[in-house]
């Protein structure tokens, strides 16, 4: 949830360019930004590869958007070039610098993603809620279900039973927010619990943050392949 202080509002009003995901991901910002000509919503830009949300059993939900788009390396690269293009329009004198920065970011981002083998069969995993779909192509993951469709709502007994009855491996990797408690997943039996932060809070370098998330996720699923 987004809390806006007066200082945030002033910074937004003073900014020459505001990049945000859009109403679907940051609804509290919509009133402030939707009519701001300097604000660009990435989800409405047409530059991203966007996937639908899935239910807790992996079925795509029609007319929905999974907003965790930044986890897909190709999307991250597109965002970098998009920002470079926008800033170049505003400051043509700095165009070469902006595009050089975008190219460097793209090279580093794609190198990080190419470190993982995507040729073998997808490695199954569970999540507390479905937030990692955009990592699956790069890390060769296969979604086998989620405990809940809302991280703030406890899983039902029926869903826990479904996961246990349909588990593809005896030992499963569970990706979850750090605030998830053992009581919420202990009935899943043999699992490797991996706390992850898909929002990358408290990180100041995107490629480094993506690498950290990828390493944790990959290690978790590989531990269940043995």
Where are these regions (language model features)?
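Extracytoplasmic metal-acquisition and chelation regions
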Residues: 2-226
């Amino acid at each position: 949830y987004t809390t806006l202080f007066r200082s945030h509002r002033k910074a937004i009003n003073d900014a020459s360019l505001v990049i945000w995901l859009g109403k679907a991901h940051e609804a509290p910002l919509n009133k402030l930004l939707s009519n701001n000509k300097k604000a660009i919503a990435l989800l409405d830009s047409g530059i991203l590869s966007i996937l639908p949300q899935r239910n807790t059993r992996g079925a795509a939900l029609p007319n929905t958007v999974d907003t965790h788009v930044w986890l897909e390396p190709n999307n991250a690269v597109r965002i970098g070039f998009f920002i470079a293009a926008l800033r170049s329009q505003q400051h043509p004198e700095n165009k070469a610098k902006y595009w050089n920065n975008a190219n460097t970011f793209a090279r580093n981002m794609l190198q990080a993603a190419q470190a993982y083998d995507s040729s073998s069969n997808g490695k199954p995993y569970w999540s507390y809620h479905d937030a990692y779909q955009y990592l699956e192509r790069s890390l060769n993951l296969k979604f086998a279900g989620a405990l809940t469709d809302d991280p703030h709502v406890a899983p039902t007994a029926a869903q826990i039973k479904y996961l246990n009855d349909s588990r593809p491996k005896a030992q499963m990797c569970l990706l979850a927010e750090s605030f998830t408690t053992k009581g919420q997943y202990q009935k899943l039996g043999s699992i490797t619990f991996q706390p992850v932060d898909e929002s990358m809070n408290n990180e100041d370098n995107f490629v480094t943050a993506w690498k950290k998330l990828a390493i944790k996720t990959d290690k978790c699923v590989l531990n269940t392949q043995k």
